[in-house]
């Protein structure tokens, strides 16, 4: 399962690749297998879902345009039950597709035609963020908790978990890493380019690249804010980017 300790490194992952183009499946299967990954191949969305449910992969790479079920439908159904990392493959001109996929819960996207090496780099970055993103950090008996509390929201950075009124908030590894970055410099803005580089590991080459940040901010607000349309925690810094509200005396240590 993607929660396992094996996800702390890029080697030895179980990766589900779904694409209706046989040449892309062949190239990715060859490249990823050579790196020691177990690669599961699907040629349509229905097959991808069946393989996902039966194999619990560590990572999913999905083409958007597939027969039977498109990539959007697959992302939506996976996200209803899992925070497994998802990378979408989209056509060059389909900016709207990229935004839709991110809104549904994809962690990142690659534009076709793409370099297999670049995809491998994206996989490494996404898996670093996901490796402890499911709460696999310090467990019972570990070091004192590093917890930030703001109102009824508490964020445990050791366990990489967030709670509102003692109810666990489901965050993907990328969403938690984004939250962690903003809180690390609360009250100070980050530009979209800074966030993209720190969390996703690459520098924006096109304006649309920074929409990855905007969409993830929107998803994070929908999970953390009482009123996402009028956020009080994750604020917009006009002309700059985003910031987390200034935190004062909100770090708690583990009680007796």
Residue locations for each model-derived region?
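A structural micro-motif at secondary-structure boundaries
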Residues: 148-176, 189, 206, 243-256
């Amino acid at each position: 399962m993607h929660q396992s300790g094996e996800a702390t490194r890029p080697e030895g992952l179980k990766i589900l690749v779904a694409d209706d183009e046989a040449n892309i499946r062949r190239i990715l299967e060859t490249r990823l297998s050579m790196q020691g990954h177990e690669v599961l191949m699907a040629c349509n969305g229905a097959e991808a879902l069946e393989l996902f449910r039966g194999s619990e992969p560590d990572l999913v790479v999905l083409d958007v345009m597939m027969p039977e079920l498109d990539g959007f439908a697959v992302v939506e159904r996976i996200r209803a039950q899992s925070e497994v990392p998802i990378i979408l493959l989209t056509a060059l001109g389909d900016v709207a597709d990229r935004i839709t996929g991110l809104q549904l819960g994809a962690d990142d996207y690659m534009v076709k035609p793409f370099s297999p090496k670049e995809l491998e780099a994206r996989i490494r970055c996404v898996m670093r963020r996901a490796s402890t993103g499911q709460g696999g950090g310090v467990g019972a008996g570990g070091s004192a908790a590093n917890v930030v509390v703001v109102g009824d929201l508490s964020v445990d950075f050791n366990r990489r978990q967030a709670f509102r009124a003692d109810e666990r908030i489901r965050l993907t590894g990328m969403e938690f890493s984004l939250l962690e970055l903003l809180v690390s410099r609360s009250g100070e803005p980050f530009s979209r380019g800074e966030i993209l580089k720190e969390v996703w590991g690459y520098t924006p080459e096109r304006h649309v690249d920074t929409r990855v940040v905007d969409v993830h901010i929107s998803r994070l607000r929908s999970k953390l804010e009482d009123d996402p349309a009028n956020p009080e925690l994750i604020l917009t810094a006009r002309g700059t980017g985003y910031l987390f509200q200034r935190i004062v005396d909100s770090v708690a240590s583990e009680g007796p």
